[in-house]
Amino acid sequence: MVKAGKAARKVGPLATSPSHLMHRALQLALDIYAEETGADGLTQRQFAVLEAVSLKAGLTQTELVRMTGIDRSTLADLVTRMTAKGLLERERSTLDARAKAVRLSAEGAARLEAARPLVEAADKRIMALLPKGQRETFLNQLADLAAAADA
């Protein structure tokens, strides 16, 4: 169960360390995600890949790197494992013979559909930890940080 409390904020210099605070926030978000999706659920990265592939069939792994922000080597390993699990299918790209195109399998589409409400519930729980007036700003700031990683 996720624990919350303001006492953890009073840790001296760590209380103003963005890297420390982001790490703690990530731990909390991962705990909530795991509670909502369950032990057999998709990981956050698996969900991100399936969601991206659902938006556009035939994406190359390079395009998936850009869409998900997952680094190239991690994504290659992830796609290989997801293909072995039957969540994705790979084929030669029609646009670039050197590249492999990725698309959802029927199993991947079913798992994605089942995961969406669970991930939405996790996201709602995370956002509910913030006052309503801060939620949009928080999301915008996270998007800015994520965009800086792509720059």
Each language-model region and where it sits:
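C-terminal regulatory/oligomerization modules of transcriptional regulators
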Residues: 1-14, 132-151
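N-terminal leader segment of winged-helix/HTH proteins
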Residues: 1-40
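Short alpha-helical "packing" element that flanks the helix-turn-helix/winged-helix DNA-binding module
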Residues: 49-50
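Charged, amphipathic alpha-helical coiled-coil/dimerization segments
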Residues: 30, 58, 62, 80-144
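The alpha-helix within a helix-turn-helix
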Residues: 65
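Short helix-to-turn junction characteristic of helix-turn-helix DNA-binding domains
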Residues: 22, 53-57
